Amino acid sequence: MGCKISTEFCSDNPVGSISTSKVHPTDLSTPSYAIKPVEFYEEPLKDDQLFYKVALAKKEYREKEKDKKEQLSSNRRVSLQVEPNKLPIPLTRSSSLSSIMENRPPSGISNSSFIRSRNTASRRFTIDTSRAKSNQYVVSLCSKKIGIIEYPDGRSDKQPCDVYWHNVVLSDMNKIVTSPQSRVNKFPGMTELAKKISLTHSISSMQKLFPDEYAFYPNSWFLPAHLADFHAFYRKAQALGKTEMWFIVKPDEGAQGTGIYLINSPNQIRNVDQRQLVQEYVADPLLMNDKLKFDFRVYGVIKSINPLSIYVAREGMARFCTEKYEKPDSSNFKNLYAHLTNYSLNKANEAYVHSNTLQDQTRGSKRLLSTVFHQLESRGVKTKRLWHDIKLILVKTTLAMLPEIMLHYEHHFYDSTGPQCFQIMGFDVMIREDGTPILLEVNAAPSLTADHIVPHPGRTLLEGGQRVRSIVDEVIKIPLVRDTLLLVLGLMEEEYQNNSLKGETKSLDDMQTIKQRRKPHLSEIFPTRYGAHSGHLLFLDKAMYIYMQFVQLRSNVNITNAGLKQFVRKCNLIDIIPVVHVDAKVSEINYYFTGEKRTNGNGLPFHAFLMFLFFIAEKKFVLENDLLSKVQRLLSFCDMSLRRYGVRSARLRRAEVDSTIGNVEIYMLPSRMARNRSGTNGRKQNFTDDNNNPNSFAHLPKINERL
């Protein structure tokens, strides 16, 4: 039996990892360029059979539709007959990593011209990049390749564009993006939600409810509020003989590694009054032969929340320190080049290794995720299992952030029908020595630049340098942006279906496509892939719905003391916490979240409201075994109590099944699909496009103020 090397991957695996598949050398019915992709890791699942059936039905439906299209266009195609015993010579594939790297397109896009020569609709899609700033080069390049008309200075005719690409979340987004049919690449409030402390609050709430599911995040303390808790943890660890514990201090507003330092005692914190995060340091990272610490930047895409759809990019980045790692001690803990993987920090070190070619990056300070997966695989690491676990981290982290994403969307587009928001996210993951992935941070605006600065000979980077092409960034970011645009415009299936060719009659273009064998750079991981595995974590949206009934969404996203008192009265919880005691409890919770004992009229954020719910649930349902069961009982109790006011929290989320292909879609804000906010002329609207927004104001049921 012969052995062929395949770099093709199914959409659930990182690009470029190497797999072997045995093919008989004389078996002309199975050309070597059609080798079966590597199979992704599967753990025993209970309810995934339904999702597999859905996927199969969807595949069969697409194939039938494709056959119809090919049949209709067959008389217009230039055909090339290929006899079974005269198959075209396949692309040469070598088992060496170098040959694979050499055969890959340097830009991350197919070598063939991909500029669309035809429209997929009655008009061409448009994109506004006037606020893209540093993202503009890559976005413009991808737009051109896809055939999107770009407006780098905005449209002079004041007509809306199909896509708006911004480099940051703009406070006046609702004034810039006025059409519900448009797509914009940022969710309102996402910058704040992804900050270190806000992210920690989101994950901490889920850890209380699902401790085993959220063990991938290090122990964390928010200062100054949690200083006493941090001291208590440290004393307990010392009593248990853990004398070599180290912690990492991160300013909440910090970025690119600024202001970060290591400590091994609470007494070493430089400013206990500063708003900052202290995390347990991962002192046992997985290392390779070069003994350099590294982490992964994995890219996720939230396609929409209506319906909810989360994707992962098959290719990511591995970022390496520039000095060899040793466990921190009093002699080396200040050497950040050995402890922090941040590119912005390490690029200033003379030991930083830039990569001019894909072959160079196998030893560079910035490498492809797939390259490192191959290197780890050769050392016996089970990379399929690792990739499976990393994707679950992306899903679980996004679900933890989801309630507040919904809240900020409703607040920002309170008086308007909002557009479809989508967002590329960067998830920083480190691997422990035992192969366990740990989430470090989430970046709401990961860099999409595809170049870097190389210092002039004999000078340091601080003295300036020359901006040159970054081959690693190109291979990662160009397909990422390109496929994200295809995804939100509904062009993904059309583009990649052309690679699944049947029959013996192929056009010349089809033969070129066979050689390229491109696969989608993005694959859906929720709800399609991991819906059965993680669907139970989609839980706190009911709490968010109740929360929004008592918040003045037009002007605020926090709940005031008056709102909490109204919640206690209308949910019949006065026997648990009398209204006169609410203010004292609010002060206690507010200090835990802000470090201030007085609310100053700002109210409590959502996760502080959750702490209030947890407190009530613990007191009201003492016979339940765990907090999750108690909170479930409390939410059901509140739901029943609020029905007399015309409110049902169970209506927040709505799942719909497409009867044609059996695909399940979960709408997190179904009220935006139905009626206007005032409740007048409340009739169901037809969907107009993927925005899932009707041509009317969104509706969120309000509580009847009459008791």
From Swiss-Prot:
It catalyses: L-glutamyl-[protein] + L-glutamate + ATP = gamma-L-glutamyl-L-glutamyl-[protein] + ADP + phosphate + H(+). One of its GO terms (biological process) is response to hermaphrodite contact. It is an enzyme of class 6 (ligase). Residues 677-696 have a biased composition (Polar residues). Residues 124-488 form the TTL domain. GO terms for molecular function: ATP binding; protein-glutamic acid ligase activity, initiating; tubulin binding; tubulin-glutamic acid ligase activity. It is found in: Cell projection, Axon; Perikaryon; Cell projection, Dendrite; Cell projection, Cilium. Keywords: ATP-binding, Cell projection, Ligase, Nucleotide-binding. ATP binds at residues 279-282, 293, 295. The keyword Nucleotide-binding applies. Residues 675-707 are annotated as: Disordered. Transmembrane segments: none annotated. Expressed in amphid sensory neurons. Weakly expressed in body wall muscles. Isoform a: Specifically expressed in ciliated sensory neurons in the head, including the IL1s, OLQ, head CEP, and amphid neurons. In the male tail, expressed in HOA, RnA, and phasmid neurons. Isoform b: Specifically expressed in male and hermaphrodite IL2 ciliated sensory neurons, and in male-specific CEM, HOB and RnB ciliated sensory neurons. Pfam families: TTL. GO terms for cellular component: axon; ciliary basal body; dendrite; perikaryon. Polyglutamylase which preferentially modifies tubulin. Involved in the side-chain initiation step of the polyglutamylation reaction. By controlling tubulin glutamylation, regulates ciliary specialization and motor-based transport. Promotes the formation of A and B tubule singlets by splaying microtubule doublets in cilia. Together with ttll-4 and 5, required for male mating. Belongs to the tubulin--tyrosine ligase family. This is Tubulin polyglutamylase ttll-11. It comes from Caenorhabditis elegans.
